Amino acid sequence: MLEAFLSVQIIVISASKAIYKKNDKSRVKMNRLFHAAAFASSMMIVAAPAQARITQLEILRTEPAFGGESFGNTGTYERVFARAHGELDPGASGNKIIQDIELAPRNGRGMVEYTTDVAILRPADVAKSNDILLFDVPNRGSKRAMLLFNADMRGSPAAFNNFEVAGDGFLQRQGTTLIAFAWQGDVAPGDNRMMVQLPTAINTDGSPVTGVVRSELTTLSPTVSLNLSAGWFTSTPPHTSYKSVETNNTKVLADGFRPTLTVRSRANAPRQEIPVNDWSFGDCNTPSETQICLPAGFQPGKLYELIYRAKEPTVMGIGFAIARDVGAFFQQTEHDDTGVPNPVVHGPKVKSIITGSSQSGRFIRSMIALGFNRSEEGHRVYDGAMPHIGGGLMPLNIRFAQPGRAWGQQVDHDYPAYDFPFTYGRETDPITGRSQGLLDRCNDNNTCPLIFHMATALELWEGRQSLGLTDPLGLRDAPEPENVRTFIMASTQHAPPSLPLPANPPFGLCQVQSNPNPHTWTMRAAFINLVGWVRDETTPPASIKPSVADGTLVPADRVSFPLIPATNYGGVTRPALRYTGAVNSLQVLDFGPGFRPEDSSGILTNEPPKSGVGSYGLLVPQVDADGIDVGGVRDVYLGAPIGTYTGWNAFRPEFFDGGFCNFQGSFLPFAATKKERIVAGDPRPSLEERYPTKEAYVSAVSKVADSLVEARMLLPEDRERLIKEAQEKGVRAGP
């Protein structure tokens, strides 16, 4: 039996390598052959247990979803809430890369155990399934896929996480089965967030593992006490904190280490140390291993940085193995070890797509790069991947990892999130001298998924996304692998704000209103295209992205942004938004000899990291006369605009000296009339100049919508909706 398994593997791998460079359809067919052969061969050796697997699926409850609402031909849905219990062989080749897995406690079989929440939305009638399993990687414990693809999603985070809101039911009308799983070990409970139980690393002599932790602390209102994990992106939702080894912050440890607390006004400002006697570990009443007290008060708009010795790190890298093993279980396994049947449609004809937004998109890229899209049986786990607004990497596989951290120009600026390699294909980094690509490991064993990389303009402005499109110095466009498509959504921000926008200043923490240009319509079209590629072997549209070659991706000092004055259009007072040509600079960061930047893995000992001399070449979108991005997917809102939409905004001056306003774009409306814009000194044509009649506006919307449908970047049903809105409402009064 084993010989037959090996023969199948060798034959298929040899054949696949011979034709892998051929056209998309040949490559996709061979990948399918390899996947089917691996699946079949894995069934031949069921007597040999996998070295990493889900051993028990504990079903907590199964019930009708969405109040019994029916969705087109699919009918009704059910929601299933469960816990998956898994185990890992720390000595297996696919698990050895996990940081500290050798220090994790083991069960009687020598395995490392974990338990993860699982949530499923499935057609009540399995025959109505579209044979697509969509795996949702939660963002800081919260489900995101429904919010990405279903329109009209209104409700609370708790309701979204409990699968109570379906919006317009887009995914359900398709017959898609949705599976979400927890992976992040430091998310605090609440709002029905998904939780995971991961082991704590322990030294072989039973003593606690310790190490240095750097925690950037911020607050939106004055306070005297914070949790040690209270960063910009780790306070809401809350994250647990690594414990300090000592609550007396004035005590010098045996090796000479003493914790420090500093403050600065912006990321590149000098750190000013706060005297050790002016702060303490605790809530200002009681000493605590997980809190900090500053009697003088933590202030908004400042970056506080605590560097302390922590203990008991969670083995966070197991999160990648969870993604691998949960995906493999639901696609290929008939039942768990206790006889509980697989609750979703599965088998060789069923295809899987993994998607995640922002933090979760970086998780997907890192999971693939570290080799976790290969199951223990040797086959590809996820057939397709759709990382959304996640251009960097996820520093999860690190001792004392802080996966809730991000990569802002001001906030979380120098946490590990952007280590070379940046591109899916191989590039050579002239700064580090390494040659590498994110798909190296999966290319070696033919387990790469078909990838739709989705990003916004903000990812280019603040998220360093251009490094995924060019060589490391930004001098030329990088070749794109055949299994990858990239779609940059022009003039969009990281995630659209809730509407209506604030009518009067202050506009949140930003200088002007945020950018409401939605992702939904482009994301829906992309999803259908990816499903067609994965399931039906339909060649997808070519990538749509700005480029160096055509002049739509340029250095920031070459952007021709218009001079837009302060205005009072519609009775809303808006200041002039000054274009500064700023970018979110990036140098090689040295976190110490225990950190492996090629894998974004290891142990951080240099905190803060030492910054290298050479800088990577960051590029941004060129714009038209209205300040709207020229390259990328220009949706209906940009083809028939009512204002300028950008991928950047600025903080109010009292926050971080006016640097990039975290993950926010800008909306600057046009004047209603020619007279109004001339009085304001606005160079952009007014609404009446662009659309002298309602019919002219409807015609403009229809023309853009038709071109997007032809390009397969807008679904026909969404074209009808957008044109109907234009016909009913005329020129949009707001974003």
Question: Locations of the language-model features?
Answer:
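C-terminal His-loop and adjacent cap/lid subdomain of alpha/beta-hydrolase
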Residues: 53-735
